Swiss-Prot record:
Lineage: Bacteria, Pseudomonadati, Pseudomonadota, Gammaproteobacteria, Enterobacterales
Quaternary state and interactors: Interacts with IscS.
Gene Ontology molecular functions: sulfur carrier activity
Pfam families: TusA (PF01206)
TM region positions: none
Identification of the protein by name: Sulfur carrier protein TusA
Compartments in which it is found: Cytoplasm
GO CC aspect terms: cytoplasm
Amino acid sequence: MTDLFSSPDHTLDAQGLRCPEPVMMVRKTVRNMQTGETLLIIADDPATTRDIPGFCTFMEHELMAKETDSLPYRYLLRKKH
């Protein structure tokens, strides 16, 4: 089985940051990405378990994978547009 988290196009380490900073950084990073590129987000704020999926839904990006069973949390999104 392939680890989706192993080769993202971009990585954002948001560890130590608290809401709303992680999502603000994700938005800024995604804005500078090309359509179809992937972003690995590494975070430890419990609010990201709600905020990152919500961001993807609201902005219509694909949340390809998430690991939130233990810290740090990892999310992989694909820019859709």
